[in-house]
Amino acid sequence: MSTYDGKKIVITGGSSGIGLTAARLFADGGARVLITGRTRSTLDAALEQLGDKAVAVRSDAANLKDIEALADTVAEHFGGVDALFVNAGVTASAPFDSTTEEMYDALFGINTKGPYFTVQALAPLLHEGSGVVLTTSVVNVLGLDALSVYSASKAALRSMTRTLARELLPRKVRVNAVSPGPIDTGVLDRSLPADVVETMKDTYRSTNPMQRLGMSEEVAAAVAYLAFGATFSTGTEFPVDGGASQL
């Protein structure tokens, strides 16, 4: 019997990066996985990797109508849910004095508002004993230039983890967060010139206590632990950051 045989898992932001790696881990272990993303072509490419036990839903993580529709789709396909990984999010940087209202609203919309209402919409489908995992960030506890809004949106999510853990405790649903540090997801390679990417990676490596970048697989392993293995943990944040938040 495979590790996750019969489990039903929903992953927002599951079409690439950490979300897709986690989806692969669960699908390879026998779970049925439903992933979301904003781009149909990216979702279709993810499905090719995940196989016939996966479902892909185009959904805007900050749009309440899409979130409500997602809950209906999950109910139709799965009935109930054993684990919810709320991973959809965006990163943007700008100095404090040039940050716009549009940027502020976009980051809080996807990184904070979206996860809140996603958990609210899917909570009725969560089985007793299930796990919710939210993706925060090492920037919750670090003061970094040009990341004031992004940091705040993720810090709010960290606080939300505690409160949702308390509110869902009577239903025996655990809520925890995974906090990635500098992770090599391939996103930089696909979006920036190679020389720029290598300079950025060198900086991340040199400033990290472990002198390297993390891998998506390392974050996915932490997600799996929080979703299923951490049966006596709720309201906590699990760092996968090479010691950046502690050393």
Predicted region positions:
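Active-site helix of classical SDR
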Residues: 119, 153, 161
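C-terminal substrate-recognition "lid" of short-chain dehydrogenase/reductases
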Residues: 125, 212-240
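Conserved glycine-rich cofactor-binding loop
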Residues: 15-17
